[in-house]
Amino acid sequence: MHICFVCREYPPSLRGGGIASYIKEVAHGLHDAGHRVTVIAASDDTRLSSDEDDEGVRVIRLSGGDFLIPQVEGNSLLKKFRMFYRFYAYRKRIREMILSLGDVDVVEVPEYGAEGYFLHDIGIPVITRLHTPMLLDHYHFSLQKLL
């Protein structure tokens, strides 16, 4: 089975966190079980792309992400506004990359960046994994409740 993970970060990354750790562990576990695994992640430098092998897991880092790491690209106001345009454009690139792989059986995305919303009609099952479900609980974690 060819499994594709989509995430904003994959180790090593300056923005790595829980999602990055989860993806790396699960991707390697699935590879070790005999599956073909591709990870599509954002490049830390939104100007650069790469395609590398991480011990059997293919890692594609896309340029043009909708967020930037100030210590890599600076922190100008213009760059912050550019991120609004890139929100859609970057998700379109993810979609195109998945389709270009040609033989993906299933795609897994976190809810955090809404990438799954743009993949609903690609003809491949898409699993949305909840990493931050408390943000979706408007009753217990709403701003109104804090006031």
Which residues does each PLM region occupy?
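Amphipathic coiled-coil/heptad-repeat helices and related helical stalk/stem segments
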Residues: I23, Y90, I94, E111-Y112, ...
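Short, surface-exposed linear patches
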Residues: E25-H28, V59-L62, K80-Y85, T128-H131, ...
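A conserved catalytic-core segment of Leloir-type glycosyltransferases
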Residues: V39-L101
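Acceptor-binding helix/loop patch of EC 2.4 sugar-transfer enzymes
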Residues: L14, L68-K80, D121-L147
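Short, solvent-exposed loop/turn segments at secondary-structure junctions
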Residues: E9-P11, D44-T46, G64-F67, Y112-E115, ...
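N-terminal subdomain of nucleotide-sugar transferases
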Residues: M1-R58, I98-G102
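An aromatic- and histidine-rich active-site surface loop
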Residues: F87-R91, V106-D137
